[in-house]
Regions:
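Auxiliary Fe-S-binding modules of radical SAM enzymes
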Residues: 1-18, 50, 64, 71, ...
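Canonical Radical SAM [4Fe-4S] cluster-binding loop centered on the CxxxCxxC motif
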Residues: 18-64
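Short hydrophobic-acidic sequence motifs that mark active-site Asp/Glu residues
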Residues: 22-24, 82, 142, 180
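Short strand->helix junction
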Residues: 32, 90-91
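Short glycine-rich or small-residue beta-strand-to-loop segments that form or flank ligand, phosphate
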Residues: 83-88
Length: 258
């Protein structure tokens, strides 16, 4: 299936379904993907299909490019709603991610004070003190929790290394509400196994995890672009709405993208 890589170190701005006008920051090189997950729905493709043989971008490279782009956008009269650290893989795995965040906050305050800073992360490095501290600095700390079922995590997200969902929930809770939980709901089949996390056996325990984490918000979405594997399909809008209503019943705001 058709997938794509982002430009580096800056891409966009693009109109995000969830974030508005988003200026992307890519800690990874443009030539490949570096991720601690290998999600079968990833718009950047599977890891093996996008091998990367270059190092992560340094904070200096990222910040120089970010400053230039913000100045260009200011001159054109349209600054981004959000500066989003995302790109071709897991941004928090970059060695100089904390320095890049600290510098981006300074640039934002100077050049685009009304813009938010967001990080889209799978959360696998969020327990590291320097990463945790950096994520506390951003406006939207968006961490992924697609399910709490260990077997389904292995099928859907395919973590590259050890992954303990209980540890992840505890880590996410340690942000004391300064976290947005992002979850994809989808249906289909992969390797002869059903892909569907919309049923009660998945939704119920996921809601229980949200109660423990107490995020400032949850954002749920479904497949919007082509995926690297065949056989995946959108969750129905009415299913997403029903899940969102249950999140909201917990006192947690929930944003839905169909």
């Amino acid at each position: 299936m058709s997938t794509f890589l982002n430009a580096s170190p800056i891409f966009g701005p693009v109109r995000s379904r969830r974030l508005g006008l988003s200026l992307g920051v890519n800690m990874m090189p443009a030539s490949g993907k570096i991720c601690t997950f290998d999600c079968i729905y990833c718009e950047n493709g599977l890891n093996a299909e996008r091998p990367c043989h270059e190092p992560y971008n340094t904070a200096a490279v990222v910040l120089d490019a970010l400053e230039a782009k913000l100045r260009e956008m200011a001159a054109e009269g349209e600054l981004p709603d959000v500066i989003t650290f995302a790109g071709n893989g897991e941004p928090t795995a970059a060695p100089e991610f904390p320095q890049a965040i600290a510098g981006a906050v300074v640039l934002r305050d100077q050049l685009a004070p009304n813009s938010k800073i967001a990080v889209l992360s799978n959360g696998t490095r969020a327990d590291r003190p320097e990463v945790h501290d950096a994520l506390m600095m951003v406006d939207d700390n968006i961490l992924k929790l697609d399910t709490v079922d260990p077997a389904f995590i292995q099928l859907l997200d395919q973590p590259v290394g050890p992954y303990d969902v209980e540890h992840q929930i505890e880590t996410f809770a340690s942000f004391n509400g300064h976290v947005i939980i992002q979850t994809i709901f989808l249906t289909g089949e992969y390797q002869g196994k059903p892909i569907d996390n919309t049923g009660e056996e998945y939704v119920g325990p996921w809601l229980a995890a949200l109660e423990r984490i107490r995020p400032q918000e949850a954002t749920i979405y479904t497949v919007a672009r082509e995926t690297p594997v065949a056989g995946l399909a959108k969750a129905a809008p009415e299913v997403l709405d029903a899940i969102a209503a249950r999140v909201q019943a917990l006192g947690i705001p929930c944003q839905v993208s169909y």
